[in-house]
Amino acid sequence: MKTFLVPLLTLLCVHTFAAEKTPLPTAHTTRNIEGWNVRVDDRLLSGDGAGAGERALKLLTARLVAITIVVPEQSLAKLRAISIELDLNYGDLRNMQYHPDAGWLKENGYSEQLAKCVHIPEVEDFLSPFENHRMPWVVLHELSHGYHDQVLGFDEPRITAAWKKFCDSGKYQSVLTSPGPMREHYGLTNPKEFFAEMTEAYFGSNDFYPFVTGELKQAEPETFALMAEIWGSLPARDKPKAAAKP
């Protein structure tokens, strides 16, 4: 009896796991939000998910508005060519991500239509108060992966060279993060994450030091100059208006 019990239990576990696996969305509605094509999971537009969908669309709109305000027009036009997909949930995927490879998607049972798109696979994670406080510019982070891939090329030598200097400096093995703990800088991972992290600090705020543009300019002046070269200059301070004559 024991020789048959283990396989039987294994089959039952596999069957239960398969039955509980989160389903993939079956239909989307495309909306234009601030110039981006956003494919919205229909489960977020009606039924039980409509409330979360409404909040997520408001949040995504706010994030995209912020990007349109600070990114120079020439670069912004190229960012807007990158589609975004917003889902209630999507299989085992949780974190927002950019999908560069249709082959990987196919191998893992996901839609190849996600290739070259920024994907928000779980609305609950997107609406997380902690994650929004920690990474308010994460949408730009993921869009910058698309820009790196589709506009510059992932083999862009200027970014690779800057990343190597960043790694070799030894300064980023343990840095302050926005929640407080010291951690290894995520930009050390590879040139792709380095570019996305530095882009967040250049235009907005990152969750690893250097957090904002002034700190980036002070700590990594060459990287700051590279961001300006690739993206364009930061917005200039508005000149004060002359007082009207009485």
Predicted feature locations:
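Sec-dependent N-terminal signal peptides
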Residues: 4-14
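Boundary at the C-terminal end of the N-terminal hydrophobic targeting segment
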Residues: 16-20
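Metalloprotease/metallohydrolase-associated module, dominated by Zn2+-dependent proteases
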Residues: 24, 102-125, 129, 163-246
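Extracytoplasmic
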Residues: 26, 33, 79-81
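Acidic/histidine-rich, surface-exposed loop or edge segments in extracytoplasmic proteins
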Residues: 30-54
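Short N-proximal segments of mature Sec-exported proteins
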Residues: 36, 139, 193-197
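Acidic/His-rich structured neighborhood in mature extracellular/periplasmic domains
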Residues: 54-168, 224
